[in-house]
Curated annotation (Swiss-Prot):
Its main location: Golgi. The gene is TJAP1. This is Tight junction-associated protein 1. Keywords: Acetylation, Cell junction, Cell membrane, Coiled coil, Golgi apparatus, Membrane, Phosphoprotein, Tight junction. Residues 394-405 have a biased composition (Low complexity). The modification Phosphoserine is found at S300, S320, S345, S491, S545. It comes from Homo sapiens.
Length: 557
């Protein structure tokens, strides 16, 4: 057994001390004590057991120490594991929060990106709107420039039109002055044919002029006395009541206008029409031809019927019904404040006198129709209007002969007056009624016959335009047809020559009545035969009025 034991290799390699012990001791002992007895063998085995026990105890202690170390390490590792787990949880929370914030920031970024896209689209639309506004501004600038140019052109046009209006105003003033200078355009009116108010105004005017000239008693006016148109113009220029269609002065406490609007109603019926009876307040014609109201005829002014107040008219009034004062006649209406013209201008009074002289011929149309004249050259028909022609035969004979020359003269005179703007010739400028030099001679001749002062009344005044005379006229006058139509001479010398023989007739027969006929020897041979068309060119534009006037027996300018 011993020889075979060392020869065997152990199963595993033992530690060095064990190998040394096992190899050295038993081998040496076996080699040295091979012949040992059993007792020695037992002793050696016991020692080996004790040594093994000692080694086992040390190994156990080491194992326990290692176990304790392992437990301590395990506790430390568990602590570290818990800490690492806590840290992991913290990290997980942080990661979760970071992830949430990231998603939130991502959503915010998406929203911001959408807003940026919308802002970009809005900016594009804004840019387009800005470009459009700039284009509109440029267009408006161009329009402003064009409108400014148009305004400048309009201003220049307005200035030119104002200059033309000024020229036309001056031309109208010149035309009115020419019409006023040419006294043969208007006929004289009988004192009895004038309206009552106009008779009172003429009587006051003549009485005031006579009192200023001589303090003696003023002569009375005869019904057949002839009132020149210039006297009517002078009377109507005075600031008195100009309401010929009202018995009361509706403008007594108000300032009067310089010019009034004359409306001639040409749409009424025949004066003798039974459909238009006299109104209660109409005046009754007196035997001497003068007009008196009903209150004055009865002798009680308190019993006068109230008349309607004066109604102001627009510049183009509608025709009114027949007035109670003048039933069946042409109503002349006035407006005091529609036409305002400066006080210095000669246009208002002249225009008013011209229209009044024309319209007065329409007022007495009723009396002309009431007495038809068998003789074609009666004064009523001869004095109906400046263009009255008693029979159509002289018109057909004289008008074609002088129509060409009169039209040419008209064109030449109007071109010279209004186009070339040349002053009127001396012969036309001197066509006034009576000058200052003619008044003393007429006073001297008419002062010899005191019996005729009821018929012949002079109108003295400080101005030459007011120094005209009221002359009588009778039916059987020896006028030529042209003089009978126009009834006024051209120059003051011819007027004086036509008026002076009347004084001689009154001196020869002072006791004769004013109803006797007197011949007025006018120098008709020295005057050229003129055509009635020299009145003006208005007949070319008022054909309806001309036709109606020809049918009624009156020619209206």
């Amino acid at each position: 057994m011993t020889s075979a034991a060392p020869a065997k290799k152990p199963y595993r390699k033992a530690p060095p001390e064990h190998r040394e012990l096992r190899l050295e001791i038993p081998g040496s002992r076996l080699e040295q004590e091979e012949p040992l007895t059993d007792a020695e063998r037992m002793k050696l085995l016991q020692e080996e057991n004790e040594e093994l026990r000692r080694r086992l105890a040390s190994a156990t202690r080491r194992t326990e120490a290692l176990e304790r170390e392992l437990e301590i390490g395990q506790d430390c590792l568990e602590l570290e594991l818990g800490q690492s787990r806590e840290e992991l949880d913290k990290f997980k929370d942080k990661f979760r929060r970071l992830q949430n914030s990231y998603t939130a920031s991502q959503r915010t970024n998406q929203e911001l990106e959408d807003k940026l896209h919308t802002l970009a689209s809005l900016s594009h639309s804004w840019i387009f709107a800005i470009k459009k506004a700039e284009m509109d501004r440029k267009t408006l600038d161009w329009e402003i420039v064009e409108l400014t140019n148009k305004l400048l052109d309009a201003k220049n046009t307005i200035n030119k039109l104002e200059e033309l209006n000024e020229r036309y105003r001056l031309d109208c003033n010149l035309a009115v002055q020419l019409l006023k200078c040419n006294k043969s355009h208007f006929r004289n009116h009988k004192f009895a044919d004038l309206p009552c108010e106009l008779q009172d105004m003429v009587r006051k005017h003549l009485h005031s002029g006579q009192e200023a000239a001589s303090p003696g008693p003023a002569p009375s006016l005869a019904p057949g006395a002839v009132v020149p148109t210039s006297v009517i113009a002078r009377v109507l220029e005075k600031p008195e009541s100009l309401l010929l269609n009202s018995a009361q002065s509706g403008s007594a406490g108000r300032p009067l206008a310089e010019d009034v609007f004359v409306h001639v109603d040409m749409s009424e019926g025949v004066p003798g029409d039974p459909a238009s009876p006299p109104a209660p307040g109409s005046p009754t014609p007196q035997p001497n031809g003068e007009c008196h109201s009903l209150g004055t005829a009865r002798g009680s002014p308190e019993e006068e019927l109230p008349l309607p107040a004066f109604e102001k008219l627009n510049p183009y009034p509608t025709p009114s019904p027949p007035h109670p004062l003048y039933p069946g006649r042409r109503v002349i209406e006035f407006s005091e404040d529609k036409v305002r013209i400066p006080r210095n201008s000669p246009l208002p009074n002249c225009t008013y006198a011209t229209r009044q002289a024309i319209s007065l011929s329409l007022v007495e149309e009723g009396s002309e129709r009431a007495r038809p004249s068998p003789v074609p050259s009666t004064p009523a028909s001869a004095q109906a209007s400046p263009h009255h022609q008693p029979s159509p035969a002289p018109l057909t004979l004289s008008a074609p002969a002088s129509s060409a020359s009169s039209e040419e003269d008209l064109l030449v005179s109007w071109q010279r007056a209004f186009v070339d703007r040349t002053p009127p010739p001396a012969a036309v400028a001197q066509r006034t009624a009576f000058g200052r030099d003619a008044l003393p001679e007429l006073q001297r001749h008419f002062a010899h016959s005191p019996a005729d002062r009821d018929e012949v009344v002079q109108a003295p005044s400080a101005r030459p335009e007011e120094s005209e005379l009221l002359l009588p006229t009778e039916p059987d006058s020896g006028f030529p047809r042209e003089e009978e139509e126009l009834n006024l001479p051209i120059s003051p010398e011819e007027e004086r020559q036509s008026l002076l023989p009347i004084n001689r007739g009154t001196e020869e027969g002072p006791g004769t009545s004013h109803t006797e006929g007197r011949a007025w020897p006018l120098p008709s041979s020295s005057r050229p035969q003129r055509s009635p068309k020299r009145m003006g060119v208005h007949h070319l534009h008022r054909k309806d009025s001309l036709t109606q006037a020809q049918e009624q027996g009156n020619l209206l300018n």
